[in-house]
Amino acid sequence: MLVDMGEQYMLTTILSFLIVTTVVAYVSWLKTKGDDLKSSKGYFLAGRGLSGLVIGCSMVLTSLSTEQLIGVNAVSYKGNFSVIAWTVPTVIPLCFLALYIIGWL
């Protein structure tokens, strides 16, 4: 029986997704199996073991979500680049917030 090339690519895509997801889940489990994830401090702040740079980068990159990658481009194309003024200035306050979270401020 001949398999349609579209079906073959879909099967390859699904299998690749399942393999990569399984590997990421297993490695994540190995790295966090001894961590305190039951308390809010352990879960949200990684037991206060992260630096301000890591927390700040995480907060900035979280704000650059799909909305930023798709929505801002569409609005900029339709109008102008003023919509980017919402994200760019937030980098500095987010860095200060990260320092406050870890207790340096």
Swiss-Prot record:
Record-annotated membrane-spanning stretches: 10-30, 44-64, 83-103
Annotated PROSITE patterns: NA_SOLUT_SYMP_3 (PS50283)
Cellular compartment(s): Cell membrane
Principal location class: membrane
Keywords: Cell membrane, Membrane, Transmembrane, Transmembrane helix
Topology of this chain in the membrane: Multi-pass membrane protein
Database matches in InterPro entries: Na/Glc_symporter_sf (IPR038377), Na/solute_symporter (IPR001734)
GO molecular function, one term: transmembrane transporter activity
GO cellular component, one term: plasma membrane
Family as reported in the entry's similarity comment: Belongs to the sodium:solute symporter (SSF) (TC 2.A.21) family.
UniProt-recorded name of the protein: Putative uncharacterized symporter HI_1315
Organism of derivation: Haemophilus influenzae (strain ATCC 51907 / DSM 11121 / KW20 / Rd)
